[in-house]
Amino acid sequence: MASSRFQSGFCPISSCPSLENFIERIKDACRFTLSAVLGTILSAVLTFFFALVGTLLGALTGALIGQETESGFIRGAAVGAISGAVFSIEVFESSLVLWKSNESRFGCLLYLIDVIVSLISGRLVRERIGPAMLSAVQSQMGAVDSTFEELSSIFDTGGSKGLTGDLVDKIPKIKITGKNNLDASGNKDSCSVCLQDFQLGETVRSLPHCHHMFHLPCIDNWLFRHGSCPMCRRDL
């Protein structure tokens, strides 16, 4: 009888919903923590990878440009390394914004792969950093006794500080159609930040004065840091 009463009062783990729920919550918390840690590590590794590749390619591009001008090999390499690292990190951050947006994850993955391939091949740095850095190097030609302000200006990537969210939202948006998706040479127009062609039906942002067009995530992320056009450097 005593044994029967003991068995009837015994509650195995499988029949205790509260204990099972507690264990499941612990498992979910562990999975969430592990996922967050792995995501942080992966983001840090990718950021370091983009910065490293951008630095190396930027230094190479800057050295070649500096060698062809009076600025010098070392100064050109230094400017190119810094510009390449900054630009590569901004491209990576724009990629993350697109990944977290409502766009197709498969399309974002293809875009990220294309960016990585372009970065490794040097196309991103050569096409976007090269012209801006060449202008910075040439502006310093003949400067022997440069002041601290002059040295700071050569590494500056924008003419003014970033814009607030309200000011960025006021910049006009346009929809890509068959009439505005070609440049002056007849080629498909593209975003100079991510280097991807504009697609019909896409909504892009057209900057005032210069009217250069960019994807919304790309240019918004830029304008929060710089108050100028990333192509022509004209202040907004």
Swiss-Prot record:
One GO molecular-function entry: zinc ion binding
Keywords: Chloroplast, Membrane, Metal-binding, Plastid, Thylakoid, Transmembrane, Transmembrane helix, Zinc, Zinc-finger
Keyword Transferase set for record: no
Lumenal, thylakoid side: 1-44, 100-104
Stromal side: 66-78, 126-236
InterPro entries according to UniProt: Gly-zipper_YMGG, Znf_RING, Znf_RING/FYVE/PHD
Principal localisation: plastid
Any one GO CC term of the record: chloroplast thylakoid membrane
Pfam families, sorted: Gly-zipper_YMGG, zf-RING_2
SUPFAM superfamilies: RING/U-box
Key word Plastid present: yes
Localization (cell): Plastid, Chloroplast thylakoid membrane
Lineage: superkingdom: Eukaryota
Membrane disposition: Multi-pass membrane protein
TM spans (from-to): 45-65, 79-99, 105-125
Zinc finger (RING-type): 191-233
PANTHER family given in the database record: NEP1-INTERACTING PROTEIN 1, NEP1-INTERACTING PROTEIN-LIKE 2
Assembly behavior: Interacts with RPOT2.
Record-stated family: Belongs to the RING-type zinc finger family. NIP subfamily.
Protein name (Swiss-Prot/TrEMBL): NEP1-interacting protein 1
Lineage: Eukaryota, Viridiplantae, Streptophyta, Embryophyta, Tracheophyta
